Amino acid sequence: MDIRILLVLELGTFIRGLETTATYDPKTREFILNTPTLTATKWWPGGLAKTATHAAVMAQLWTQNKCYGPHLFILQVRSLEDHTPLPGITLGDIGDKFGYNSIDNGSMQLNNVRIPRDQMLMRHSKVTLDGTYIPPKNPRLAYGAMTLYRCQILIICSGYLARASTIAVRYSAIRRQTETKPGCRTYFHTLL
């Protein structure tokens, strides 16, 4: 199971401004997930365009007519039998990217997608069967997952940058320049 969700169009780094909602329905014991605007579209998730079957989705938690801020939910996005998107889920491919094309990045919109209550990640905060919200001991814990994932991307990209720099330095150390004057056989080596 490949679980990744990274960005949304409206956010940048302002996680509290997240537009995606997860509204708890105590009658059915389900959360209803929505991306109510175009800017709430989940954007750039790795593996989402063609391969991922599940995603960790961050959404504003609503229960008992009150918003409790961003929380994580596990969402199945594709059928495990024929790999088609599930009802209410619109998936797309964001196309070519500069420097990170090997990752299958996509987009996702949600329209009244219902998931069971137990698909909310409830290690630090909880929603009881009747919809009562139990807050985490430390409210900053909710932001740890997003911060960790962003740090991992920086670490991965720094490895790519180090490899590219090594190739560039090695190539420039042995590269021959063109003739300074036609017919002159003197070559200059470029060294950094």
Language-model segments: which ranges?
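A short core secondary-structure module
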Residues: 26, 30-90
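Non-transmembrane, amphipathic alpha-helical segments
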Residues: 102, 146-153
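Short Pro/Gly-enriched beta-strand edge/turn motifs at strand-loop
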Residues: 2-6, 88-92
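Short Gly/Pro-enriched turn/cap motifs at secondary-structure boundaries
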Residues: 10-13, 97-101
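Generic, well-ordered alpha-helical scaffold segments in large soluble proteins
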Residues: 21, 60, 76, 109, ...
